[in-house]
Design a protein with these regions (language model features):
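Intrinsic disorder in cytosolic terminal tails and internal cytosolic loops
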Residues: 1-5, 130-131, 440-462
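Juxtamembrane intracellular "pre-TM" segments in multi-pass secondary transporters
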Residues: 1-9, 207-249, 457-462
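Substrate-agnostic recognition of the 12-TM MFS/MFS-like secondary transporter fold
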Residues: 14-33, 48-67, 74, 79, ...
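Juxtamembrane helix-start motifs in multi-pass secondary transporters
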Residues: 72-78, 189, 306-313
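C-terminal ends and interior cores of transmembrane alpha-helices
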Residues: 81-99, 105, 315-331
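A membrane-interface helix-boundary motif in multi-pass transporters
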Residues: 166-195, 393-433
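Helix-loop junctions on the cytosolic side of multi-pass membrane transporters
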Residues: 171, 182-186, 193-220, 439-453
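C-terminal transmembrane helical hairpin of 12-TM major facilitator-type secondary transporters
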Residues: 308-354
């Protein structure tokens, strides 16, 4: 039998490879245009993203009960099998088949959400529990630091390859690849990701589960109800904690608008006139900036007040939304890419600040479920934003019907995005202002004061 140290080393290695393979998707740099090029409308694309977010929310809580009933390793392996099914659906997806294409995408998004929910937390728990108790926290911090480096590097490589092979112009310039059709190039990133899915499955089998399964005879339904009850109890605790309420509401607003851009990003680059082969270069640049941002925000937590830090994030998001709304196409479209930088800075900063401040205001008995609750509500908010984006697009399509009539599908998609983006900075600004007014009227103080009040018993000297 392996020693505890050997099991810990094996699980750490499996965890690093599992996360890298599971999250490195060759189609991310061309995510939006992939769906649109398969023949979907923008409204259908928005609906599918809403369904994906909803499936994560619905399956997240039952997945905890499944982990307790079946074992964490089995849940991680199941999530890897779901990834294989998810990618097979994409690989054999018919192009432009109308309702059939949408139906297969719908199943794909539900399976993808289930896979995300099943491995969420279970893979981390397999590693954390296997690390010897002495020095566990320090060892876990080192594991997360290694994971960040691995993921940043692989994300850059995968983004560059995925965008390049999707571009018909790029592929046809390569020796031995001339004459490839657009349809063939569209499927290359998907076949590459199918290979990643099988590699993910192989790695998932390497985990060793050191956590004993529940010996209770409770049914899966009873365990699921208990999980939902625990989440509702956490929600009630959050409502009694003003600082936690404000932090989560702020996170929901900021995260949903940032993810809205991340979702439609590849269509924005197409609108600027940038070839798909450069999308990977853009995302790789974003990943590099994200690494540098992590070093800066760590210092900002100790220098600036919480309200100033999150106010800075709001300013970044507004600047990004305002910039993309103007669709500046100078320098062959690259001037417009400059306004994407605020989103990269905002995303990395936001989640670091939220993690720091929520940990500060949450007691140890609620900390884990508060962070889980934050993740669930963020996915729910993202789903709602995508629903409203779909409704906005449908309304714009109806209102500009005569203007859109002579345009082809790609030109129509670009025009609708152009019209929609002009609204976003002002909607975000209005919602942010309403949030500030609500906090001031409801709690009679700002975020910094609420955090200081909440953390006062354990941070009296600060």
């Amino acid at each position: 039998m392996d020693s505890p140290a050997a099991i810990a080393t094996r699980n750490i290695t499996a965890f690093l490879w599992f996360r890298v393979l599971f999250n490195s998707r060759f189609y991310y740099p061309i995510y939006t245009i992939l769906f649109l090029d398969f023949g979907l409308s923008l409204e259908e694309f928005a609906t599918l993203n809403m369904v994906w977010a909803a499936s994560i929310v619905l399956f997240e809580v039952p997945s905890g009960a499944l982990a307790d009933k079946l074992g964490r390793k089995h849940l991680v392996v199941f999530s890897a099998w779901l990834m294989v099914v998810e990618m097979l659906l994409l690989c054999f997806m018919p192009i432009g088949a109308g309702p059939l294409t949408f139906a297969m995408f719908l199943v794909n998004r539900i399976v993808s959400g289930m896979a995300e929910a099943c491995c969420s937390g279970a893979d981390e728990a397999l590693v954390y529990d296997a690390i010897p108790a002495a020095g566990r926290d320090a060892a876990w911090t080192r594991v997360l630091a290694r994971l960040m480096r691995w993921q940043s590097l692989t994300f850059m490589i995968v983004a560059l390859i995925g965008a390049a092979v999707y571009s018909q112009d790029f592929m046809n310039r390569l020796p031995g690849f001339t004459g490839l059709s657009k349809e063939t190039c569209m499927r290359i990133p998907l076949w590459l990701n199918l290979g990643m899915a099988f590699a993910t499955l192989a790695v998932s089998l390497r985990f060793i589960d050191t956590h004993p399964r529940s010996t209770e005879r409770a049914s899966l339904g009873a365990l699921t109800r208990a999980s939902f009850a625990q989440m509702l109890a956490t929600g009630r605790w959050i409502l009694r904690s003003p600082a936690a309420v404000v932090l989560i509401l702020t996170g929901l607003l900021y995260d949903s608008f940032t993810r809205l851009f991340y979702t439609i990003g590849s269509n924005y680059y197409r609108l600027l006139g940038i070839d798909e082969s450069y999308n990977g270069l853009i995302l790789a640049g974003g990943a590099a900036i994200g690494i540098g941002t992590a070093l800066v925000v760590e210092k900002l937590v100790g220098v600036l007040k919480p309200s100033h830090n999150l106010g800075m994030v709001a300013a970044l998001i507004f600047a990004g939304l305002l910039g993309i709304a103007h669709q500046i196409t100078a320098w062959n479209g690259w001037a417009g890419v400059l306004f994407v930088v605020p989103f990269w800075l905002a995303m990395r900063s936001l989640h670091y600040f939220l993690s720091q401040y929520l940990n500060k205001v949450s007691d140890s008995s609620h900390r884990a479920t508060v962070l889980s609750f934050k993740g669930l509500t963020m996915n729910l908010a993202y789903g709602l934003v995508m629903m409203f984006y779909g409704m906005q697009t449908a309304w714009l399509r109806h209102g500009h019907e005569s203007e859109l009539a002579p345009l082809g599908k790609q030109e129509t998609d670009e025009k609708l995005l152009s019209l929609a983006m002009s609204w976003w900075p002002w909607i975000f600004a209005a919602l942010a202002a309403l949030l500030v007014i609500f906090v001031r009227l409801r709690y009679r103080r700002g975020l910094t004061g609420l955090i200081a009040q909440n953390a006062a018993p354990s941070h009296a000297g600060t």
